[in-house]
């Protein structure tokens, strides 16, 4: 209501994992529910050609985007009161992406970013979704961060090199994974909460992973500062 939303885009798999069927049924009385599975089925040949040729000929398919216009409305986690809707422009998000790129050395031909964090939070959206697209990095999305064993196995099978996480989640993944499951990771970018010394020691000793800890806020798109690796 605060963002004047009229449509909700989701996926049946996400609804199933979260046992959100009753909520979706209630919301469907006020909003149009769009399932990504249905969108995929309705893609025309023209849509598929545009999607395939777009990366090769970007200037032919690029839509003009006013950078000052609203790009996204994200709601804060509510740690200091009721959640607030934060309006971010395209320029806000893209500027923060470039700032992060200037701080983290990325290798498009080698790096694989693993993002289990939700994109309805700014960290998961800016760093976990927009950044790898702009940087040309292969990205693996996982529908929920609450599956430590499955995530550890999937990191191994995809040979991911960068993990997005929080202190709580990366310590769970390190403990839940078998020896060697996280060995492909060279870096974990952590935010949302302070990284404890014991977490750094755990992942460094068990998996030889360096943690890049960031500080930020949704209003800042979200990264404000980050430590240097090493």
Language model: regions and residue ranges:
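Short beta-strand->loop structural element characteristic of the AMP-binding/adenylate-forming
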Residues: 1-9, 32-36, 85-87, 115, ...
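Short, structured coil segments at secondary-structure junctions
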Residues: 3-4, 26-29, 135, 183-184, ...
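Conserved structural elements of the adenylate-forming
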Residues: 51-58, 67, 86-106, 116, ...
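Short acidic loop-to-helix transition motifs that present clustered carboxylates
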Residues: 1, 145-150, 170-171, 195-196, ...
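Gly/Ser/Thr-rich phosphate-binding loop
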Residues: 49, 160-165, 174-230
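Conserved AMP-binding/adenylation subdomain of ANL enzymes
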Residues: 94-112, 120-162, 176
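Conserved pre-ATP/AMP-binding loop-to-beta segment of ANL
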Residues: 33-75, 82, 105-112
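Structural core segment of the AMP-binding/adenylate-forming
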Residues: 1-48, 159, 166
């Amino acid at each position: 209501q605060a963002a004047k939303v009229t449509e909700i885009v989701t996926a049946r798999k996400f609804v199933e994992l979260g046992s959100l069927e009753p909520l979706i049924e209630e919301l469907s009385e006020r909003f149009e529910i769009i399932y990504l599975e249905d969108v995929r089925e309705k893609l025309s040949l023209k849509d598929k050609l545009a999607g395939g040729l777009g990366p090769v000929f970007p200037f032919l398919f690029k839509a003009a985007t006013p950078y000052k216009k609203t790009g996204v409305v994200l709601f804060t986690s509510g740690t200091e009161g009721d959640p607030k809707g934060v309006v971010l422009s395209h320029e806000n998000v893209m500027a923060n992406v470039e700032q992060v790129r200037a701080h983290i050395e990325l290798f498009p031909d080698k790096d694989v970013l693993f993002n289990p964090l939700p994109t309805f939070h700014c960290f998961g959206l800016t760093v976990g979704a927009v950044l790898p697209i702009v940087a040309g990095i292969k990205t693996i999305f996982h529908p929920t961060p609450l599956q430590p064993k499955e995530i550890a196995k999937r990191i191994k099978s995809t040979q991911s090199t960068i993990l997005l996480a929080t202190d709580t989640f990366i310590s769970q993944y390190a403990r839940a994974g078998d020896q060697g499951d996280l060995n492909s990771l060279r870096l974990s970018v952590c935010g949302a909460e302070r990284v404890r010394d014991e977490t750094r020691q755990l992942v460094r000793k068990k998996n030889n992973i360096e943690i890049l800890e960031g500080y930020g806020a949704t209003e800042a798109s979200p990264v404000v500062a980050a430590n240097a690796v090493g």
